[in-house]
Amino acid sequence: MDVFECVSTLSSIRVYDDRQADMETMRRVIEAGRLAPSAHNDQPWEFILINEQERLQQMAKYCISGSFIIQVSFAVVVLTDPRSKWQQIDTTRAVQNMVLTAWSMKLGSCWIGRLNEDGLKKYLKIPDSWDVLTVLPFGYFNEKIVPRVKMRKSPGEVFHLNEYGTRINE
């Protein structure tokens, strides 16, 4: 699957089957995050790979909007360095790399943003010097349920040419 096909078919997945990813697959996903570009090459991220089912079950307590984490093959806790000026943008680029790489390997994901960060940091022994940006669950899913039709604004609604207000015709 090429990059544009990944981007155009990507969907948030919240229901997973019981197939397990192997270590090579998990490493490829986090390697995609590590390879993301960053301002001044700061690389303001670290990743915690969680593949023990017992830990995933416990993490559901801290994932306020992501109880589906109990179904996944593995998850990545994405840490970001708050001392880096562009840390949120840079680390989000790493997240997108991981999500698209996983999608290209038929693994679904859904960004979990509502977290009990203090509880999660304590549970995973994350130092106070790091912030948790997100938890990314990854797992295999029934491919018959996706892709669904994406509701997006038309290009004419969001594209401008050379200056704001000059619309690019579709």
Language-model segments: which ranges?
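Acidic, surface-exposed loops and disordered segments
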Residues: M1-E170
